[in-house]
Amino acid sequence: MLQLKNLTIRHKKDLRPLLEDFSFTLNEGDKAVIISEEGNGKSTLLKLIYDKTLVEGYVEYTGEIIKRGIIFGYLPQEFPPEYKDIPVYSFCCQSEGFLNATPKQLASAASRLQLDSAFFYSEQPCGTLSGGEKVKLQLSLLCLTEPDIYLLDEPSNDIDIETLQWLEDFISTCPNPVLYVSH
């Protein structure tokens, strides 16, 4: 269970609030979406939940984030630019879940994401993947880490209609809680 109690997030620079007195509980099997306009702190909230060091340089917060022992699977809004020139296989090798996976687990993750398991071993540079392929690649690696909760930051950006339908199915059938943000 993830619980936020009376969470307020402010920019350090001008103390402008991004979120005020926000309380929220995500229980087993829950699916929740936070929708608002761009620039209103949705990504900051997910980063804060996942790893406060990702945002401590530009925001401060008060309140409680209760996440005892939870393993998060975090999908960032943008594919990390530092990986654009490396092959898919090299990107996969940076995931502990991938390195520890059995061939059966890899095949299962690939099937769940409608990928061929050979995709994980591709020499294709990550920067040449479509938006949908990047989302599926990252989600497949998250699945292999077996997180307790998925945190998805704008997962529907830069994907086609077919991949969007697949993403909706993935979220709705995922047995784990999912918190995602959109605009």
What is each PLM-predicted segment?
Residues 5, 24, 124-128:
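Pre-signature/interface helix of ABC/ABC-like ATPase nucleotide-binding domains
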